[in-house]
């Protein structure tokens, strides 16, 4: 009998671990967006919008939870970096605070309630216009978060920073798609539902994919930084 040869294993370098985390993040983003889009369009075009659990535009279902969890993952990654390192602590603390607020808001629909209260009750706007006032109310926070993520992407591990910026790009792209609802929602109320159904699928997909990629990029960057620190 011959002795078994020891298996050759690749060293778990920080970069290798970071790349693995990024691959997982990309796969998760594609799978989540694909499933959400397929479920939403199936419900709208084949099930006549009868299943609220499959509607990406309905608050309080599994898709809401997924979006809120993705935002909270960004907050957790920022917290880990804030606790472990002294570099860019102020920026990571701000990301932690804003991402936590966004996650809570996404789960409880605070922004929509405020927008509808002001838009409908005070300004007399139709609901499809009133609900989009949240973009104005939250504009300072949106700009702050975008600037923070862009800045941090320059100072973290390269591939993680690129994933972070890609996620940010998807989130920015979702805003004009949201605004298009000012046109497609009235069409939906007049019986032409397909344009708004497709718009919702695109908007929600961009948001979910953007937050998942941002979380994956920041998590991978923090993991690489922690492993490098341990090696030193």
Region roles according to the model:
Residues 2-232:
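Hydrophobic alpha-helical segments at protein termini of multi-pass membrane proteins
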